[in-house]
Amino acid sequence: MRTIVLLIASVFIAPGVLAQSQDSDKAGVWLDVPFIKQTVEGCGSASIAMLLQYWSAHGTQIAPEHMDADAIQKQLYSRKGHGIYASDLERYLRDTGFRVFALRGAWNDLREHLSKGRPLILSIEPGGSHAPLHYVVATGMDWQREAVFVNDPARGKLLRIERAEFEKEWQATKNYLLLAVPASAPAE
């Protein structure tokens, strides 16, 4: 019931952002990031497209062709790498007019940036070991239950992953976190 109340409240708090009003430490945050289903080995291009469509919906001017997952895939895909290299994700976002920061992230980094309305591209290793690397978009957190919500281009929108499982999958990629904010956004 509390979740339903919080979801309804999100409509009145700020478009696409959910947080409990005065005591946000008790609830969490959820960003309404559009979901894009990936093609085979297309998690990187789908993740970029989700991120760009989110920022476009929040007032950033982005050419439609730059937000098209298929066009991104054709431009960046590496046959050798069976996907898109992180450095190519970063370059593409810079070329599209974003300030880009690739970090070795921590749980608190997720909380900080999601609370500020900034979705994040993360690299995980589903299952935690020996699976192919996979990009997802972090879209929210449940602070009470210590869980992260992701748009997983292979599995669906707003998937909830418990912290222990998530950190195992994320640590397998050395906690790769990609923060991309419009160049026109104020620096914080």
Residue ranges: model-predicted function:
Residues R2, Q20, R79-G81, S115, ...:
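Noncatalytic regulatory segments and standalone regulatory/sensor domains
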Residues R2-L6, S10-G81, P126-S129, Q144, ...:
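Active-site-adjacent structural segments surrounding the nucleophilic cysteine of cysteine proteases
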Residues S21-Q22, R91-R94, E169:
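Short, conserved catalytic or adaptor-binding loops enriched in Gly and charged residues
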Residues T39, G44-L51, D68, I72, ...:
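Stable alpha-helical elements in mature extracytoplasmic
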Residues Q61-M67, S78-S87, F98-G105, V137-G140, ...:
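Short, exposed beta-strand "edge-strand" segments with a Pro/Gly-rich flavor and a Y/T-containing core
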Residues I72-L120:
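Mid-length scaffold segments of soluble, non-membrane domains
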Residues R99-N151:
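Active-site-adjacent substructure of cysteine-protease-like catalytic cores
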